[in-house]
């Protein structure tokens, strides 16, 4: 196999790996967003006798959470706004759809890269047979 073809295949493999990593990251984000939607949508939090609140670095404190009042939501650049639980759920559902759309775009890119890899590989294999 020619060096330039091998380099091209290695490059395509690295792109596929990068896309796979991005898909994995987005899948994890999607799970987190869905969990938050579920938490805000059902009454389990209110009926739970013990609530643990993350205070960072893997530490938790017992506390009370009231989600019937406005939630404090970051909107960027250190700015926060108050938002109703219902509005937060709507926003999170939109975020979830955006994540799904991004995953689909990445899956399409991955398919294109795999097709490109297979084409380069098959072309080189055909050349070597002759």
Curated annotation (Swiss-Prot):
Looking at the keywords, is Hydrolase present? no
- Pfam family of this protein, just one? Prefoldin
| Compartment(s) where it occurs, according to its Swiss-Prot or TrEMBL record | Cytoplasm
Query: Which GO MF term does the entry hold, naming one?
Result: unfolded protein binding
Identify the keywords attached in UniProt to this record, alphabetized: Chaperone, Cytoplasm
GO CC, sorted alphabetically, is: cytoplasm; prefoldin complex
Q: Which Gene Ontology BP annotations are present?
A: protein folding
Q: Which top-level group of life is the source organism from?
A: Archaea
**InterPro entries from the xrefs?**
PFD_alpha_archaea, Prefoldin, Prefoldin_subunit_alpha
| Quaternary structure and partners | Heterohexamer of two alpha and four beta subunits.
The entry's family comment says: Belongs to the prefoldin subunit alpha family.
Function, as annotated, reads: Molecular chaperone capable of stabilizing a range of proteins. Seems to fulfill an ATP-independent, HSP70-like function in archaeal de novo protein folding.
Please report the name of this protein according to its UniProt entry: Prefoldin subunit alpha
User: Native species of this protein?
Assistant: Thermoplasma acidophilum (strain ATCC 25905 / DSM 1728 / JCM 9062 / NBRC 15155 / AMRC-C165)
């Amino acid at each position: 196999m020619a060096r330039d073809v091998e380099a091209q295949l290695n490059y395509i493999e690295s792109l596929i790996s990068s896309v796979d990593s991005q898909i994995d990251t987005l899948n994890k984000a999607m799970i987190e967003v869905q969990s938050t939607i579920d938490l805000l949508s059902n009454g389990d939090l209110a009926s739970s006798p013990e609530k643990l609140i993350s205070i960072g670095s893997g530490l938790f404190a017992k506390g009370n959470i009231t989600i019937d009042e406005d939630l404090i939501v970051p909107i960027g650049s250190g700015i926060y706004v108050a938002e109703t639980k219902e509005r937060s759920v709507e926003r999170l559902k939109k975020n979830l759809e955006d994540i799904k759309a991004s995953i689909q775009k990445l899956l399409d890119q991955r398919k294109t890269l795999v097709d490109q890899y297979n084409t380069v590989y098959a072309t080189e294999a055909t050349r070597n047979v002759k």
